């Protein structure tokens, strides 16, 4: 288990035959001033990781970013007595045998223990959500992006989406946040160069047009930089 930054712990599980050989990742958020200890998209924890989590303080909340990332959530809910919540739009996709272990749901625009819920439209599941911590400038994603060892970002194969073009365009909202650390549910997370990696990704996305603006003169008030033109507006 790696501490990415103060109170942000990250652990990885490797599974043979997984997509492109990437790891499945879980995130644990603890720290002073945080209302809850939050475990996100947890793969199974090994004995050492369980001891580490217990030493930090058992999680009180388990957040699942999409229906396909339930993973070891129900098992860890039982072990730690934590509440488990899922995206409201994915609630019907939770397997029936686990439905009784879901304690609640959430929707875009809500806040979970200080984390802003960011709705990601037209993804693999309708409830796919990002979790943004403004204090840490930390974004946590489930299946929305995959990280490669070289620091590049990619999508799941087109076959995973009902409309791949809309799925790509649906990630535009990620450029609306200041992100210093990008934690991914699959593959390599980024602790530096996040903005550059996102811009490199979107430059290869035909559904998204980027425009560089000067301070106070862009589509949004605020600092200079790259902004997204919504092509459907």
What residues fall within each predicted segment?
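Residue-level marker for the onset of beta-strands and adjacent loop->beta junctions
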Residues: 25, 106, 127-129
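Short acidic-hydrophobic surface loop/beta-edge motif
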Residues: 2-4, 29, 107-113, 131
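Pre-active-site segment of Zn-dependent metallo-hydrolases
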Residues: 10, 16-61
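Short solvent-exposed loop/turn micro-motifs enriched in small/polar/acidic residues
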Residues: 19-22, 101-104, 122-125
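Active-site HxH/HxHxD metal-binding segment of metal-dependent hydrolases
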Residues: 44-112, 208, 215
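Short, hydrophobic/aromatic-rich segments at coil-to-beta transitions
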Residues: 5-12, 113-118
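Metallo-beta-lactamase
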Residues: 15, 35-39, 45, 116, ...
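C-terminal regulatory/interaction regions
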Residues: 215-233
